[in-house]
């Protein structure tokens, strides 16, 4: 009787091994579910990024405002008649223009 119990216990263990640790076992399924959830999060972020880029492309293709905004922010362009004002924090040294630079006169400073 004791031998039969041991044999049945070993058989039960052999049957349970593929269920828990085998190729399609619970641990593998759990790990794959975790990977799928992480990929869903990544995909959601990429979908939001794609939607924003698509809206920007659509705006650039149809609207002048987006092109103007990009030219101002990325290229530093201004409209005619606008005045550029740059605020320099106190204590920052003011760069001196190079000799012969445009806008600098060769005459002595005025008094």
Curated annotation (Swiss-Prot):
Spans through the membrane: 4-21
GO CC entries: cell division site; cell septum; plasma membrane
GO biological process, one term: FtsZ-dependent cytokinesis
Compartment list: Cell inner membrane
Cytoplasmic compartment segments: 1-3
Region (Disordered) residue spans: 88-111
Stretches assigned to coiled coil: 31-62
Periplasmic side: 22-111
Biased composition (Low complexity): 101-111
Biological role: Essential cell division protein. May link together the upstream cell division proteins, which are predominantly cytoplasmic, with the downstream cell division proteins, which are predominantly periplasmic.
Subunit description: Part of a complex composed of FtsB, FtsL and FtsQ.
Protein name (record): Cell division protein FtsB
Annotated source species: Bordetella petrii (strain ATCC BAA-461 / DSM 12804 / CCUG 43448)
């Amino acid at each position: 009787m004791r031998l039969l119990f041991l044999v049945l216990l070993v058989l039960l263990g052999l049957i349970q091994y593929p269920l828990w640790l085998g190729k399609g076992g619970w641990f593998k399924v759990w790990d794959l579910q975790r990977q799928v959830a992480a990929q869903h999060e990544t995909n959601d972020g990429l979908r939001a990024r794609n939607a924003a880029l698509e809206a920007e492309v659509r705006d650039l293709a149809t609207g002048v405002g987006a092109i103007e905004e990009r030219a101002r922010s990325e290229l530093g362009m201004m409209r005619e008649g606008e005045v550029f004002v740059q605020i320099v924090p106190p204590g920052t040294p003011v760069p001196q223009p190079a000799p012969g630079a445009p806008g600098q006169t060769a005459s002595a400073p005025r008094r």
